[in-house]
């Protein structure tokens, strides 16, 4: 199952897995009637005032891939779930509990970007990656352009959880480690793309 999130709603493709998508498509693949139809639907879904999820079944990965490329500019990012003493690191940005993440720079792989962004946003050092987690996908409007952000998540450890330094120039006001008792609150108040994608992983690790 593949999901794209926009604000607190989701577009769900139950018969497609993320690994089936190929977002490196040629211009000729963008011109079919099916691709045009899904592209138009995506544009309508982004602007219509809906609160419920929408499910689209029976679509091929090839058509969806081409429609996504036609509709969005890709903005890949990477981030981390940092563990220490049975807790995980969360940040507060714009008053919303979140996880540290940021854009992948040119020439970086996702793992390197995740380590860099987590250290920059939290001040945590001594970071090591344990394993990769599921990828979240959400879209947003930036300077009149719709963007689709796949965020590649990694489970991490830190050897020094006692020293944090929130990146205030990125509007991060707090870095804190949350326990299993805080998890329900976090999942209820964070972005749905994080709660749906990483919720079970966080429950397992805490």
In which residue ranges do the predicted regions lie?
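Short hydrophobic/aromatic beta-strand or adjacent loop that forms the aromatic wall/cage
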Residues: 1, 77, 149-153
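Acidic, metal-coordinating catalytic segment for phosphate/diphosphate chemistry
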Residues: 35-79
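Unchanged
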Residues: 103-193
């Amino acid at each position: 199952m593949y999901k794209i999130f926009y604000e607190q709603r989701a577009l769900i493709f139950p018969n497609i897995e993320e690994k089936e998508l190929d977002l490196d498509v040629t211009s000729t693949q963008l011109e079919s009637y099916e691709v045009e139809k899904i592209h138009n639907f995506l544009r309508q879904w982004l602007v219509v005032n809906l609160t419920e999820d929408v499910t689209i079944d029976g679509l091929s990965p090839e058509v969806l891939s081409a429609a996504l490329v036609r509709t969005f500019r890709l903005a890949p990012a990477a981030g981390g779930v940092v563990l220490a003493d049975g807790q995980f690191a969360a940040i507060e940005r714009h008053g919303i509990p979140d996880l540290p993440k940021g854009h992948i720079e040119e020439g970086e792989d996702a793992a390197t970007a995740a380590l860099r962004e987590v250290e920059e946003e939290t001040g945590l050092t001594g970071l090591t990656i344990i394993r990769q987690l599921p990828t979240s996908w959400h879209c947003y409007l930036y300077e009149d352009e719709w963007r689709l952000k796949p965020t590649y998540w990694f489970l991490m450890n830190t050897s020094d959880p006692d020293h944090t330094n929130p990146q205030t120039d990125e509007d991060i006001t707090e870095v804190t480690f949350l326990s299993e008792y805080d998890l329900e609150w976090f999942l209820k108040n964070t972005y749905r793309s994080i709660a749906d994608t990483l919720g079970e992983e966080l429950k397992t690790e805490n």
